[in-house]
Amino acid sequence: MKSAKKLLSVLCLGIFILTFTACDMVEKTPEAKAKSTIAKVNGEKIQRKDLDESPSMQQVLSQIKTQYGEEFEKSEQGKEVIKEQKKQILENLITEKVLLQKGKELKVIPKDEELNKEADKKVNEIKAVYNNDEKKFEETLKSTGFTKETLKEYLRDQIVIEKVINEVTKDVKVEDKDAQKYYNENQSMFTEKPNTMNVSHILVKTEDEAKKVKKRLDAKEDFAKVAKEVSQDPGSKDKGGLLGDISYSDSNYDPTFMKAAIALKEGTISNPVHTQWGYHIIKVNSKKEYPVKKFDSVKEDIKKQLKQEKQQEAYTKKIEEWKKASKIKTYEKNLL
């Protein structure tokens, strides 16, 4: 099972790894179900087997079996969960089909010899994950529903998709001034060591409650005592509201909460801060802040990051445009 997961994670790693003739109701055989049409994209069919055999679907089924057991997918709840997952994966397969069609239109598909060479290189990279153990590699292929031939065909498609994406994003550029602006606005991200702060908070439901809490704290009542009395955060209430050390870049906290906390000076308490959880009174107990790296030492990293973001935006905009212009029809009744 671990080997299978390893291969699936390799195949599903890239940002753009996306992986039924309509049947009459009387067709109940596995073969007929596999060939049933689940979508048409500009006249080209996507069959149920394309979805069921995709790495994404295999990974979903593996996770479901690990989490809920072998029988879960046969239950009504399991079928509903799987159907929702299939709908998401089908959307990816439709995107993949549009990209492959555009590959022909844009004339970016390499000749077979070159395409096979690139696919073989990727196969060898996957084999390297298994220390080039051919037996283990073949066993894993079998357990994930691949043969050497179908794996290579899958990789050929992914190579074409990469080339389409490269064509769409080839003109994206980032200037030094863009990097400088980002650096100036986000200097806490470029310190010699990550900046951290030790934070406590009191969480209440309403703004009026928060104002009353702030008034008590302004009157010099003990923060921890008030937190234990009124805070509605079960994770920190009994600790006097203490959240502990938090990195300035920690994405586990609400962005509004983080912005307010970072803006506070050491030892100070905020006014009420509204987030999705309610109203917070935040106290920064201490801070550890480090010198900011020189712009020239981080410029290229910033430009690389900004370029990737712009490429993603350009790709997303283009694929939405292409899909909107395509004739797409789905047949959700054939998903199960």
UniProtKB/Swiss-Prot annotation:
A lipid is attached at residue 23 (S-diacylglycerol cysteine). It catalyses: [protein]-peptidylproline (omega=180) = [protein]-peptidylproline (omega=0). Residues 1-22 form the signal peptide. InterPro entries: Foldase_PrsA, PPIase_dom_sf, PPIase_PpiC, PPIase_PpiC_CS, PrsA_foldase, Trigger_fact/SurA_dom_sf. Residues 194-286 form the PpiC domain. Keywords: Cell membrane, Isomerase, Lipoprotein, Membrane, Palmitate, Rotamase, Signal. Gene3D superfamilies: 3.10.50.40, Porin chaperone SurA, peptide-binding domain. A lipid is attached at residue 23 (N-palmitoyl cysteine). It holds the Pfam family SurA_N_3. Its main location: membrane. GO terms for biological process: protein folding. Its EC number is 5.2.1.8. GO terms for cellular component: plasma membrane. One of its GO terms (molecular function) is peptidyl-prolyl cis-trans isomerase activity. PROSITE patterns: PPIC_PPIASE_1, PPIC_PPIASE_2, PROKAR_LIPOPROTEIN. SUPFAM superfamilies: FKBP-like (SSF54534), Triger factor/SurA peptide-binding domain-like (SSF109998). It is an enzyme of class 5 (isomerase). It is found in: Cell membrane. It comes from the Bacteria. It is a lipid-anchor. HAMAP family: Foldase_PrsA. Plays a major role in protein secretion by helping the post-translocational extracellular folding of several secreted proteins. PANTHER family: FOLDASE PROTEIN PRSA (PTHR47245:SF1), PEPTIDYLPROLYL ISOMERASE (PTHR47245). NCBIfam families: PRK00059.1. Belongs to the PrsA family. This is Foldase protein PrsA. It comes from Clostridium botulinum (strain Hall / ATCC 3502 / NCTC 13319 / Type A). The lineage of its organism: Bacteria, Bacillati, Bacillota, Clostridia, Eubacteriales.
